[in-house]
Structure formats: C-alpha cells, structure tokens
C-alpha cells in the first residue's frame, strides 16, 4: 500500500490536542455505541453480556450454558499484508471469545473484495483465504460456512480486502463468565507478550 510521507515542516504548527481529537474521532477508534444501542439487546431477557465488550453472550435456556458471539473485520491489516491480515482476523475472533471465558467452537466468514479480474485483487483474495485457513487450522477453529462477495468497487478501484469473521464459542457455566469492567479500585492491568512494531496498521 501507498504510505503518506510526513515532512518535517508539516509538524511545525501541529498541536497535540488537535492530533488526539482527530485520532479519537476516527471511525476505527471512536465508540461504536451509537450503532449497537439501536438494537434492543434485552429482548427475551437472554443477554447476559451486554454490547460494548469483546463478545456478546446469551444464555441457553434450561442450562447454565451460554453462547458467545463476536464479529470481526480486518481491512487495514489485509490491505497491508493479505496473508497476515487473514490470520489476524481469525485470531482476533478467537481472542474476543476467550476474553469472556468461552471456548471457541467455529467461525463463518464473509469475504469482500474488488474485481477478481484484477490480478492484484485476486492475489489479495488468495493470500487472505490462505491466511484464514492457516490460522483456523492452527487454532482448531473450523470454518463451517462462508460467503464471497466480489466486484465491490467504484469505477475501476476496488475496496480494501475486507474479510469479516463471525465466531461462536461455548461457556459451560455462565456464572464464570468474564466481563470487561474493572471490579474494584486499583485493579491491575497486564499486557502479555511483546507489543513493539504494531503501530503501522493499528
């Protein structure tokens, strides 16, 4: 992908508060609450993990079990590197499910790409599918269904390669479900693993 080059003179009058506001208001960063609040997630009283976290959770009637669901997409990662982006979106779905205490069971996908008649678009598609397959096999997270949508473009320009993954997981006892909110003052936040090198497509 093309990279925007920043010149030193462009930074002279830059104010950090303006940069922060711009970043926090970007659709990829800002709150998505206005979207999911439009649906009444309390219908039938089955929702036990409200929207806003990494996965939604609904109870299974007559049991202590619950089903967790997550939908993830990775256009920016796939645009930068389709193989890695395909792996990343499967891993994100997996992480979002285990973050609420669910055992990931299976995924479905919706693969959105430009025209397959364009060699670059077709190459992105092939690599992305390969990445999804490799990650799913490694994680034992089977792809049970899927859909491909080609020719998503304006004139001759295709959209960024956009795989969307819907994942489901099982929680055997929803009383042990994990929620994202802090439980008390001075809770500790831990970062596991190395974090360097992720800013480019974050």
Protein language model regions, located:
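Glycine/proline-enriched, intrinsically flexible loops and inter-domain linkers
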Residues: 1-202
